[in-house]
Amino acid sequence: MTSIKTIKSRAPKDYLVFALDVPTVSEAAEYVHLLKNHVGMFKVGLELFVRGGRRIIDTIHDAGGGAKIFLDLKLYDIPETVYRTMNAIAAMGVDFATVHCSGQKDMLAAAQEGADGQVGVLGVTVLTSMSADDVRDAGYGPEYIENISRLVMKRAAAAAEWGFAGIVCSPLEVSAMKERFGKGFVAVTPGIRPAKGLVSRDDQSRISTPGQAIRNGADYLVVGRPIREPDDSAAAAAAICKEIEEALK
């Protein structure tokens, strides 16, 4: 199982996670081949896993040049189902897998038990697409509407309580999270947008540049469209690695 505590020296690319948000295994395989020397981890989400299943995991193992694998299924179900699913995920040889922190405590405990020390469980706190209005519409009170970070920290505390490897949160909450839970508690951050360049149909609300996320203490930066949409995806990934390198100095 991957642990930040065991990583003595990390290259800039080791912080970069490419989101394989594509519809087919063949297209994903092309990106794995293209980016294996430019990113340290590949993220497999719901659409690709539903379409490709275990094949995409095997593809990354075979062609990813040693890159890590983040299976982002955001499990949320009754405890027994989550336990059995996480146990099956652990057998695939992935490095991280996600579960929603908004679930009951027994579900969180089941996720950690099912992982059996073979995969790092990450708690999804609040989606980076959520705004204050979304939090209000979900039925939360003023305490969380006025400060989404409070809801993130509440859910991060649940993840820490049950021994998760870390959480998924916006770059804006990383600094406070590290201060409270320590540097060894992994922070995986979506909502990353390069200092230069826009993306189409941007549905993220709580965002940051790669450099700022690193300075805040993020351990992994999840990037999809800013790498996928340019004509030269490898160059786009290299440019983000350059931003990471500058922030690490």
Curated annotation (Swiss-Prot):
Q: Which domain of life is it from?
A: Bacteria
Q: Which GO terms describe its cellular component?
A: cytosol
Catalytic residues, per the record, are 74 (proton donor)
Any idea which UniProt keywords this protein has?
Decarboxylase, Lyase, Pyrimidine biosynthesis
Organism lineage reads as: Bacteria, Pseudomonadati, Thermodesulfobacteriota, Desulfobacteria, Desulfobacterales
Q: Which pathway does this chain act in?
A: Pyrimidine metabolism; UMP biosynthesis via de novo pathway; UMP from orotate: step 2/2
EC number, UniProt record? 4.1.1.23
Named from the GO MF annotations, one term is: orotidine-5'-phosphate decarboxylase activity
Query: What is the protein's quaternary organization?
Result: Homodimer.
Q: What is this protein called?
A: Orotidine 5'-phosphate decarboxylase
* Catalytic reactions on record: orotidine 5'-phosphate + H(+) = UMP + CO2
Where substrate is bound, by residue? 21, 43, 72-81, 128, 193, 204, 224-225
Family designation: Belongs to the OMP decarboxylase family. Type 1 subfamily.
SMART domains reported in the protein's UniProt record: OMPdecase
Q: Which Pfam families match?
A: OMPdecase (PF00215)
Mention one GO biological process in which this protein takes part, according to its record: 'de novo' pyrimidine nucleobase biosynthetic process
- Name the CDD domains on file: OMP_decarboxylase_like
UniProt signal peptide: none
Report the protein's function. Answer: Catalyzes the decarboxylation of orotidine 5'-monophosphate (OMP) to uridine 5'-monophosphate (UMP).
Lyase recorded as keyword: yes
| Gene that this sequence comes from | pyrF
